[in-house]
Regions:
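Gram-negative bacterial Sec-dependent N-terminal signal peptides
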Residues: 1-19
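A generic beta-sheet turn/junction motif
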Residues: 142, 208, 285-289, 375-377, ...
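Gram-negative/organellar outer-membrane beta-barrel architecture
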Residues: 166, 186-378, 547-558
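C-terminal beta-signal and terminal closure region of outer-membrane beta-barrel proteins
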Residues: 507-559
Length: 559
């Protein structure tokens, strides 16, 4: 009964005295903005940790050599050999389509040169597919007068040199006794070297059996833990701009070449009256071409709004839990293609004083499928990720659309693309980075799933204005150059960003924003200092107050 009276009093007070209570849209936008930033920041942290140091073999143009094995050739001669043809034996790893690419032999006169050419082409086919230990030998003609080409395709006899930091059973599962394929070894090295404490290489040595090879792992191991502490003014004015951050990582805590990370941050200003705190935990485990990950994040905020006659409190918290699996289904010397699946649970609770704001407090369960591509270019790297998210009525998620909650069973598509390339300008080397992100949904999305165009991870330069919407895109462009100053590295940069959003909650149509930025990063041993000056403009609404010039600073140290 008391709760009913309190709620009724609140509603009546809102209707009778708009001057004493904040606007409902303002409360919704503020609470939703805090929740959205918390969830999207933790998602970015998880993705960065998962992608960090992956694909080192490809980016470094691999640590393994690709020597073309020397085939046993006949003496060079154009004279006809006393043979009626050529037959192959021992070929199991090449398809008929592969073999059809071989040059045809003459029907009447087959010379040593023809046999040598065929042997080289056959060997090259194996090498191109990654079977670098395949050997082609010439055997005497059979009863039909056909010369034989016998292929020893090569297999992994044994893998040795593993330890608790490089767990060969999980990095190279099931490879012993199977054909030696270079891309599978590269994949295992990628998994080993994704741990910052590992610098793993391998040697391919002759085995005891015919065609067998021994894989010997060599690892230079550093300390398995890292702690990074820092501070920056990337926070919000409502909850505090200056934040303290700390990240702790531990490599192979269970001897499985696994990885665990804990990230925490909190605002520093007046924590008794306003704060924003967030924690993210990630664990990942490799298994050959698979990487399995689990993550959890929690955040809370509180701020007090000064009204003409009193002070009111807005506060809330977010929870996010997820399971993810990544699978590399194709790779060669220049590219990697992978698939991933993820299940995420999100719960958001926002309050005005003690009243839960239902409109900005959804509970969601999302399934996401994505495909990724990484391509090494002559002067850079290109990566892209295309994904689809589907809301599900599982784990207590909101089930039905209503006037309070938008449909939690939405479908959303996302596209991320990044091009990083080296440029030569006036005899100096520059780095140009172009990053594109876009999302689209035919369904009205919950506010925590909107794209925030004025977030510093999108269009840089905004500290006051907010532009959010269901659908939209942005493009970040950054030109930088690294200069060595003694043992320090200074990297100045210039940035220009643009983006558009289409909110479904009103009929104003597309909205556009742009931003310019300049900054510099100084790295000296384990210390980092970053300064940035930026400014953003709302291009589609001239009634919006202009944002001032924004100055951001970040300091961090790795222990």
């Amino acid at each position: 009964m008391i709760k009913k009276i309190t709620a009724l009093t609140l509603l009546v007070s809102t209707a009778l005295s708009a001057e004493t209570l904040p606007d409902s849209h303002m409360m919704r936008d503020m609470s939703m903005g805090e929740s959205r930033r918390a969830l999207q920041d933790s998602t970015r942290e998880v993705n960065q940790l998962i992608e960090q140091r992956r694909y080192q073999q490809l980016k470094q143009q691999r640590l393994l050599a690709e020597p073309e094995p020397a085939a046993r050739a006949l003496p060079q001669s154009a004279q006809c050999l006393p043979i009626a043809g050529v037959y192959l034996q021992g070929v199991t790893l090449l398809s008929p389509a592969d073999l059809s690419a071989l040059s045809a032999l003459p029907e009447q006169c087959i010379s040593s040169n023809d046999i040598n050419r065929l042997t080289r082409e056959l060997t090259r086919l194996y090498v191109q597919k990654g079977y670098i230990t395949a050997r082609v030998q010439i055997v005497r003609p059979n009863s039909q007068g056909e010369l034989g080409l016998s292929v020893t395709e090569g297999f992994i006899e044994k893998i040795e040199g593993g330890d608790r930091w490089v767990n060969s059973r999980l990095l190279f599962p099931g490879l012993e006794g199977k054909p030696l394929k270079l891309t599978e070894l590269d994949q295992g090295l990628d998994q080993a070297n994704r741990l910052q404490s590992n610098t793993t290489k391998l040697d391919i040595l002759p085995g005891r059996q015919v065609g067998g090879s021994v894989i010997r792992l060599r690892n230079q191991h550093a300390k398995p833990w890292l702690i990074t502490a820092g501070t920056d003014n990337y926070g919000q004015k409502s909850t505090g701009q200056w934040l303290a951050r700390a990240t702790a990582t531990l490599d192979s805590p269970f001897g499985l070449s696994d990885f665990v990370s804990l990230n925490a941050n909190s605002t520093l200003e007046n924590p008794a009256h306003r704060y924003n705190r967030a924690y993210t935990l990630l664990y990942s485990l490799p298994y050959g071409a698979f990487t399995f990950s689990g993550f959890a994040s929690f955040s809370s905020y509180e701020n007090h709004q000064q009204l003409p006659h009193n002070v009111v409190k807005l506060h809330g918290q977010t929870q996010q839990y997820g399971l993810r699996s990544d699978y590399v289904f194709y790779r060669d010397r220049d590219q990697i293609d992978s698939l991933s699946g993820q299940l995420t649970y999100k719960r958001i609770d926002n309050y005005f004083e003690s009243v839960r704001l239902e409109v900005s407090s959804p509970t969601l369960t999302l399934a996401e499928l994505s495909a990724s591509h990484l391509q090494i270019l002559p002067n850079g790297v290109f990566s892209a990720n295309l994904s689809v998210e589907q809301g599900l009525p599982w784990l207590g998620a909101d089930r039905h659309p209503s006037s309070v909650h938008l449909d939690s069973q939405f479908t959303k598509g996302k596209l991320f693309a990044n091009l990083s390339q080296r440029l030569k300008l006036a005899d100096a080397t520059y780095q140009l980075n172009n990053l594109f992100y876009g999302q689209y949904s035919r369904d009205p999305l919950p506010g925590v799933e909107w794209l925030s165009l004025t977030d510093r991870s999108a269009v840089r330069g905004f500290s006051r204005s907010t532009q959010t919407g269901d659908n939209g895109w942005y493009l970040q462009n950054t030109l930088s150059r690294s200069v060595n100053i003694g043992t320090a590295t200074l990297t100045p940069r210039l940035g220009a960003d643009v983006g558009r959003i289409l909110p479904r909650q009103d009929s104003s149509g597309w909205r556009s924003s742009a931003g310019l930025s300049s900054g510099a990063t100084l790295r000296y041993r384990q210390a980092l200092v970053d300064l940035e000056v930026s400014r953003g403009w709302i291009l589609s609404n001239h009634a919006t107050p202009e944002d001032p010039v924004q100055v951001l600073a970040r300091f961090s140290y790795i222990f």
